[in-house]
Amino acid sequence: MKLSTNVKGLKGRIRVPGDKSISHRSIIFGSLAKGVTTVRDILRGEDVLSTMQVFRDLGVQIEDDGNLVKIHGVGFEGLQAPKNKLDMGNSGTSIRLISGVLAGQDFEAEMFGDDSLSKRPMDRVTIPLRQMGVEIAGRTERDLPPLKMKGSRELQPIHYQLPVASAQVKSALIFAALQAQGESVIIEKEITRNHTEDMIAQFGGQIEVEGKEIRIQGGQEFTAQEVTVPGDISSAAFWLVAGLIVPDSKIVLENVGINETRTGILEVIEAMGGRMTLSDVDPVAKSATITVETSELKGTEIGGEIIPRLIDELPIIALLATQAQGRTVIRDAEELKVKETDRIQVVADALNSMGAAITPTEDGMIIEGKTPLHGAQVNTLGDHRIGMMTAIAALLAQSSQVELERSEAIKTSYPNFFNDLEGLMHG
């Protein structure tokens, strides 16, 4: 598709779609709780719909009237063996978290996904699950999907040090540990997003978190809840950056989730000198209204413990850095290589084709700013975040057309992205 270029004056208010991480987990916890869980403002992107369909295939009744989702929970012991293979689509979250759920079930299941998911290594989940007594195998020594598995009702607890900072791996092990016979201890490499831990408490379960150490007792039961999903800061990130770099812009984002394990991008914007204010802060819902305006930005260094708190925002942060004066260095982000694409290389290639000066490194990138951008042809390679990053970059392109191939990937997390962009352009 042809993207809008050379745009000025983005103005308006946006309510970004529901948080993807919380949407996935609300379906999982609702299915594993006893009673009827209701979920408002759920994200209806393709990844979350994959999770919803998988739990239907596992015997859970889920109603969705387009406004409210009702989940008739069956508890851990009420899941049924699926009649067919379980389709995870493009969703790494689905396959990893659900493998943890299935670890404590005594039936066989096979999980598969699309071409992109089939290239993503699952060994970081399968290795600890095997230690707990799960039979699980994929393709090659990295356990690429499809994954065939048979869980166990006599799951052994685990004491495990995570070799990578990954909320998905941590959450898979937590779901398994909840079904194990005794106490499990999981130690994180760096603190990652904690939605799973928060929701265990919300659904009436017990979990102890002290710094990077997590303790979970097996054999727990959950009680149905009413869940309202805040807006996704990872989706809001595209508008935060657009508002900062497109001339004469002011964008107001309502009901954005500001869970402390996800707000790294706000710290980066402050470090770069961005004009940004938070209002209507709700400490219980962990949400706020965020306003950004066009700003003079300066380069910064991004690395260490902040990386897990902005891992999904790094593609759009790279674009932000191309419009900042001076050098920005991103390091400790090797996890980007095993996302939907190798996001280090793909981000550099896409933005460099538009005139940026980005050098990919083993664990991040070096970005020289400020650089003018121009037209190019960019392929998302099926990665939703590359698609949205390119659409925002195109707004700055001074000459020639920006053509985006495989733009449908954006529906993974933000089905109404282009409608919202249109609204801001006419705001």
UniProtKB/Swiss-Prot annotation:
Catalytic activity: 3-phosphoshikimate + phosphoenolpyruvate = 5-O-(1-carboxyvinyl)-3-phosphoshikimate + phosphate
Xref: InterPro entries: Enolpyruvate_Tfrase_dom (IPR001986), Enolpyruvate_Tfrase_sf (IPR036968), EPSP_synthase (IPR006264), EPSP_synthase_CS (IPR023193), RNA3'P_cycl/enolpyr_Trfase_a/b (IPR013792)
UniProt keywords, alphabetically: Amino-acid biosynthesis, Aromatic amino acid biosynthesis, Cytoplasm, Transferase
Ligand binding (phosphoenolpyruvate): 20, 92, 120, 168, 343, 385
Stored Pfam families: EPSP_synthase
Residues that, per the record, bind 3-phosphoshikimate: 20-21, 25, 166, 168, 312, 339
EC number(s) given by UniProt: 2.5.1.19
Biological role stated in the UniProt entry: Catalyzes the transfer of the enolpyruvyl moiety of phosphoenolpyruvate (PEP) to the 5-hydroxyl of shikimate-3-phosphate (S3P) to produce enolpyruvyl shikimate-3-phosphate and inorganic phosphate.
MF term (GO), any: 3-phosphoshikimate 1-carboxyvinyltransferase activity
Subcellular location field: Cytoplasm
Record's subunit section: Monomer.
Annotated coiled-coil segments of the chain: none
Annotated protein name in UniProt: 3-phosphoshikimate 1-carboxyvinyltransferase
Active site: 312 (proton acceptor)
UniProt cross-references to CDD domains, sorted A to Z: EPSP_synthase
Involved pathway(s): Metabolic intermediate biosynthesis; chorismate biosynthesis; chorismate from D-erythrose 4-phosphate and phosphoenolpyruvate: step 6/7
Family: Belongs to the EPSP synthase family.
Class of the enzyme per the UniProt entry, highest EC level: transferase
Gene Ontology terms describing biological process: amino acid biosynthetic process; aromatic amino acid family biosynthetic process; chorismate biosynthetic process
GO cellular component terms, semicolon-separated: cytoplasm
PANTHER family: AROM/DEHYDROQUINATE SYNTHASE (PTHR21090), PENTAFUNCTIONAL AROM POLYPEPTIDE (PTHR21090:SF5)
